[in-house]
Amino acid sequence: MQLQRSKDNMASHAKPIVILLADDDEEDRMLTSDALEESRVVNDLRFVEDGEELLDYLYQRGRYSDPDAAPSPGLILLDLNMPKKDGREALREIKADPNLRRIPVIVLTTSKAEEDIYRTYDLGANSFITKPVHFNALVDVMKEIGRYWIEIVELPSGAPHR
């Protein structure tokens, strides 16, 4: 027996989710946003600039204390090299918290270091993707992320905040 889904059928199964992008580089945030838009991965995209702000968002602290300002993400795109608290530290805290650990975290970074790959998977990352250099390649990556994480897999509904 062969299982096939048409693109239309898959698109009808896509559920809108909040995508939270944690990246300190404004240009990378805008390129990723443009690539998501170009790839037609239409969702609610939110930005944070470092690991501390990411955790503030997830725990609804500080400027994110209003639940409308920080809806629960269905997916986190995480850069590793950020100021204040880097992506590795933030990932460790997210995956150690029973209220947050189910949120899929995709590491999206310029690193190709094998040490980073092993370490982030050991910390609980769901995927490790090296940021493509060319915009069209980034669009292709965003299409595949959207296809897999939004159209194909079943994600838990928003993780409860503390």
List the predicted regions and their residue ranges.
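Non-catalytic signal-transmission and effector/linker regions of two-component phosphorelay proteins
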Residues: 1-20, 26-46, 50-55, 59, ...
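Receiver (REC) domain active-site loop signature in two-component systems and cognate sites
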Residues: 80-82
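Short, conserved "switch-loop" micro-motifs in signal-transduction and mechanochemical regulators
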Residues: 110-112
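Short, glycine/charged-rich "phosphate-handling" switch motifs in NTP-dependent
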Residues: 126
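Hydrophobic residue at a beta-alpha junction
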Residues: 84-85, 94
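A Lys-centered signature of the CheY-like receiver
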Residues: 131
